[in-house]
Design a protein with these regions (language model features):
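N-terminal glycine-rich FAD/FM-binding segment characteristic of electron-transfer flavoproteins
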Residues: 1-262
Length: 262
C-alpha cells in the first residue's frame, strides 16, 4: 500500500475582490476585509485531488498535514470529507511569523514524525504568496527527489512518472520513490464531498501537534519583507478632437505616432 502525504495550507479566499484587502505597512502583511472566508489553498486542493486519483488506481493511504497559528477546523476537515484517511494539524502561536524556509522545516519535521511515506504532494505554490518554495524545501530537508508542476502522476514498480507542465506543452519526468511532487492546477479541481463524507467527518478523529510535540526549535527565517505596498496608478485621459469620426481617427493616429505608442 502506498503511503501518501499531502501538505495543505489554509489561505484567505484568493477569489475575493482585491479592493477588499488592505495593507499593514508596519507589519508588512495583507489584511483581508471582515467576511472574506478562509479556504484551502487551491493548488493544494489540486495536490489532494492527485492523491485521490492515485488511491482510485491502487491501494493507498492519504495523510493530510497542515501547519499554522490557528487553523479553522471547518475548512481543513474538508480534506477528510473528500476522502483523505488521516489529518494532522500542527498549530502553535510560534507560527505567527514564518517564511518559506520555516514552513518547509515544520512540514518536513512532521513528515519525519509520521514515519513511513512513499509520496509527498504539495501545491505548486500558495495562493497568498505565490512563492513556490515550500515544496522543494521539504524535499531538500527530507533528502528526497522533487518533481515540480505536475499535471498527471502515475506510481508503479517503485517509481513515479510525472507529466510536468511547460509553457509549450509538457514533459515527462520519472523518479524513484520516496519522492515529492508539486502539483499544478492542470491536474484538475478537487472533487466535491459527498453527503456521506460530510456526515462521516463530523465524528472522524484527527491529530493536533504543536512545536513541543515535534521536539524542535524553530530556525531563524531566511527571508524578510522589506516593503509591502499598493503601487500608485496614474491614469491620464485625453480626448482627441475631431469634427467627424474620420477626423478624430486621423488625429488619434497622429497622436499615437507623436507619443511613440504606435
Amino acid at each position: 500500500m502506498l503511503n501518501i502525504i499531502v501538505c495543505v495550507k489554509v489561505v484567505t479566499d484568493p477569489e475575493a475582490p482585491a479592493t477588499t484587502f488592505k495593507i499593514d505597512p508596519e507589519g508588512k502583511h495583507v489584511v483581508p476585509a471582515p467576511g472574506v472566508p478562509p479556504v484551502l489553498n487551491p493548488y493544494d486542493e489540486n495536490s489532494l485531488e492527485a492523491a485521490l486519483k492515485i488511491k482510485e488506481a491502487q491501494p493507498a493511504r492519504i495523510t493530510v498535514i497542515s501547519a499554522g497559528r490557528a487553523i479553522p477546523r471547518s475548512v481543513i476537515k474538508k480534506s477528510l470529507a473528500v476522502g483523505a484517511d488521516d489529518l494532522i494539524i500542527i498549530e502553535d502561536e510560534a507560527f505567527q511569523e514564518t517564511d518559506s524556509y520555516i514552513t518547509a522545516f515544520i512540514l518536513a519535521t512532521a513528515v519525519k514524525k509520521v514515519g513511513t511515506f512513499d509520496l509527498v504532494l504539495t501545491g505548486r505554490m500558495a495562493a497568498d504568496t505565490n512563492a513556490g518554495q515550500v515544496g522543494q524545501g521539504i524535499a531538500e530537508l527530507l533528502g528526497i527527489p522533487a518533481v515540480t508542476d505536475a499535471r498527471k502522476i502515475e506510481v508503479g514498480n517503485g517509481k513515479v512518472r510525472v507529466e510536468r507542465v511547460r509553457a509549450d506543452g509538457y514533459e515527462i519526468a520519472a523518479s524513484s520513490i520516496p519522492c515529492l511532487v508539486t502539483v499544478s492546477h492542470e491536474m484538475g479541481n478537487l472533487r466535491s464531498a459527498t453527503v456521506k463524507g460530510l456526515m462521516a467527518v463530523q465524528k472522524q478523529p484527527f491529530t493536533v501537534w504543536n512545536v513541543a510535540d515535534l521536539a524542535i526549535t524553530l530556525p531563524a527565517g531566511r527571508s524578510q519583507a522589506r516593503r509591502l505596498f499598493i503601487p500608485a496608478r496614474e491614469v491620464n485621459c485625453e480626448i482627441v478632437p475631431g469634427e467627424t469620426p474620420e477626423a478624430a481617427g486621423a488625429n488619434l493616429a497622429i497622436k499615437l505616432r507623436e507619443t511613440s505608442r504606435f
